Amino acid sequence: RETLEHLIQKHHLEKQVRLLGYRNDVQDVLQSADCFAFPSKREGLGIAAIEALACEVPVIASDNRGSREYMCHTENGIVCQADKVADFMDAICRMRQSGQLRREMGERGRRTAERFSIEATDKIMRRVYQEISVTQERKR
């Protein structure tokens, strides 16, 4: 945290960047954001990024196995290489400069996140279990 605070001060970003720590009001915080930066080098599914998409917040994510499941470059956010900090900075600046871009990507992001909702996941799992059940009955 100290390193981040130092960088924020060094680049005079105190008005633009806040380190919030643990919060109970994540949805409210996300909905007030211009974008959600998710620079993980390795990630499973990336629930935090999907939560941001569900709140219509465009995501700037690193290209990894997990983000490929939900990120579509320039559709619901921007995909960058994890080790290219300048690309992340450019993407963040691009998001801050265009409200229209944020709104368009945010709307498409919400639709993306719907694929990962509890209801959608439940439907898929029920179908899988049904297929397994039918397959097992045929083997008997």
Walk through the language-model features, giving the residues of each:
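Nucleotide-activated donor-binding/catalytic signature segment of Leloir-type glycosyltransferases, i.e.
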Residues: 3-21
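Aromatic "clamp/platform" in nucleotide-sugar-dependent glycosyltransferases that forms part
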Residues: 22, 41
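Short glycine/serine-rich donor-binding loops of glycosyltransferases
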Residues: 46-49, 67
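Short hydrophobic beta-strand element within catalytic cores of glycosyltransferases
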Residues: 58-61, 71
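Conserved acidic donor-binding segment of nucleotide-sugar-dependent glycosyltransferases
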Residues: 73-74, 78-85, 94-99
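A short, well-ordered alpha-helix in the C-terminal region of glycosyltransferases
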Residues: 87, 94, 101-115, 124-127
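C-terminal alpha-helical cap of glycosyltransferases
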Residues: 118-140
